[in-house]
């Protein structure tokens, strides 16, 4: 039970809502559209409802979770959704070609595929960073960069794998901050290992 509690706590701390998609969700709800959420997830609906609420994702009609339904999207979760909702037309939005695309289509549901943050990341020159992220600390840092720079599924990338950073802050967060953070960690570990008492920082004015 303690492990489960800790896992849920960590999920709450690290999950990042995709702002543009949350905005679209809210506009759909505000316009009176019937919106349901469907997910393949090992956590039960009661836990997910709390996480969604904390991220301002409210107003949906139903939450269909494979963990509770004992059915994945591949195994009939979409059919269960249609049976419960009973409408003439359905549109599903997701980021997985098979689970959100093919499975929805086979269930007679129209679908729109968006790119996941990781999917967008892999299309850019940043993708090479995964070869160098070996430690947990480095992978966490990379995850933070992906969550920030590729939060929107509408980020523009070129065929050459280039992307346009929208603000100066993004340059600092995605490029400078990881370098400085890595240096700070290295410096701390070196000081501890060498039992250094004093550190002198040289600075140049101007």
Regions inferred by a protein language model and the residue ranges of each:
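A short, well-structured juxtamembrane/interface segment
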Residues: 17-24, 179-193
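Substrate-recognition "cap/lid" segment bordering the active-site pocket of phosphatases
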Residues: 36-89
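Extracellular glycan-modifying ectodomains
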Residues: 1, 119, 125-189
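Short, acidic loop-to-helix structural element flanking the phosphoryl-transfer center
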Residues: 2-36
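Short glycine-rich phosphate-binding loop at a beta-alpha junction
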Residues: 36, 40, 196-203
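Acidic, divalent-metal-coordinating active-site segment for phosphoryl/phosphodiester hydrolysis
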Residues: 95-111
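Short, solvent-exposed loop/turn segments at secondary-structure junctions
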Residues: 41-45, 70-71, 97-99, 117-120, ...
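Hydrophobic/aromatic interaction determinants used to assemble and anchor large protein complexes
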Residues: 22-25, 101-104, 115-118
């Amino acid at each position: 039970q303690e492990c489960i509690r800790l896992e849920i706590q960590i999920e709450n701390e690290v999950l990042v809502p995709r702002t543009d998609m949350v905005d679209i969700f809210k506009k759909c709800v505000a316009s009176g559209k019937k919106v349901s959420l469907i997910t393949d997830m090992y956590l039960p609906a009661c836990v997910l409802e709390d996480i969604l609420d904390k991220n301002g994702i409210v107003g949906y009609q139903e939450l269909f979770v494979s963990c509770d339904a004992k059915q994945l999207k591949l195994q009939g979760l979409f059919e269960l959704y249609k049976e419960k909702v009973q409408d003439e037309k359905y549109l599903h939005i997701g980021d997985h070609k098979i689970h959100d695309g093919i499975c929805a289509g086979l269930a007679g549901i129209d679908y729109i595929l968006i790119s996941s943050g990781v999917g967008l990341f892999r299309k850019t020159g940043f993708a090479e960073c995964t070869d160098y992220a070996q430690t947990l600390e480095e992978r966490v840092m990379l995850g933070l960069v992906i969550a920030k720079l590729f939060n929107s599924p509408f980020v523009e990338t070129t065929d050459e794998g280039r992307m346009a950073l929208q603000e100066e802050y993004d340059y600092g967060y995605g490029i400078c901050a990881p370098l400085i953070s890595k240096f700070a960690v290295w410096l701390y570990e070196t000081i501890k290992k060498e039992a250094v008492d004093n550190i002198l920082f040289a600075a140049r004015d101007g």
